[in-house]
Amino acid sequence: SWTSSNNPVNLWTDGFAAIQNVNLFLEKVDEVHWTDDEESRKLFACRLKGEAYGLRALHTYFLLRNHAGFSNDGELLGIPLYDSYLGSDANFNQPRASFYDCVKHIYDDLDKAEQMLPMEYNDISNESEIPERFQPYTSRKETYNRVMGHYGRQLFNALIAKGLRAR
C-alpha cells in the first residue's frame, strides 16, 4: 500500500536499477585488478560475484513479492527478467516472465551465491580448514582469511542465501 515511507513505483524503479547495476558489475568484475596477489585477486572476484548473485536474487525477490500478479486470463505473472546489462539503446519493453520462471531465476542466483561464498565470514587457523570449493583458488590460510575471513562479516554470505531461499 502507498504510504509516505512506501511507494511501490519507487520499488519498481529502484529494484530494476539495482539489478542493472549488479548485471554491469558481473560483466566487469573479472577485469578489475583487486590486488597484486593472483590468488587473492581470483578469490576476491569469486566472493564478489557470489555477493552480486545474492544481491540480484534479493532484489528480484522484492520485486516479485511486490509486483507479481495475475494476467487477464488468470496466469500468475512475475516481472521481466534481465540477466545481463542493458544499454540505453536496449529494448526495455519486455513481457513479464511467469511467476515460476522468476522463482527459478532467484533460486539459480542463490545456487551460484552459495557456491561462491562461505557459510559465514570467519578466519581459519590452518590450511586444512579451507573449504573444498575454495581450494582451487588458494592453499594459504592468510589469503583465505584476507578475503573470506572476519573482515567480510556483515556481507552477503551463504547463510543469508539459504535464509532467502527459505522465504
Language model feature labels by segment:
Residues S1-G69, F92-D101, L110-E120:
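Conserved, well-structured interaction surfaces
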Residues S1-N6, L86-N91, K141-R146:
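Short glycine/proline-rich turn/loop motifs
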Residues W12-T13, D36-S40, T143-L159:
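Outer-membrane beta-barrel proteins
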Residues A18-L26, L81-S84, L159-L164:
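Well-ordered alpha-helical segments within folded domains of soluble proteins
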Residues F70-Y85:
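Short, flexible, mixed-charge acidic loops at enzyme active sites
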Residues L110-S125, P131-F134, Q154, A158-R167:
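Aromatic-residue-lined binding/catalytic grooves and analogous aromatic/hydrophobic interfacial grooves
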Residues E127-G149:
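Acidic, Ser/Thr- and Gly/Pro-rich intrinsically disordered linkers and low-complexity segments
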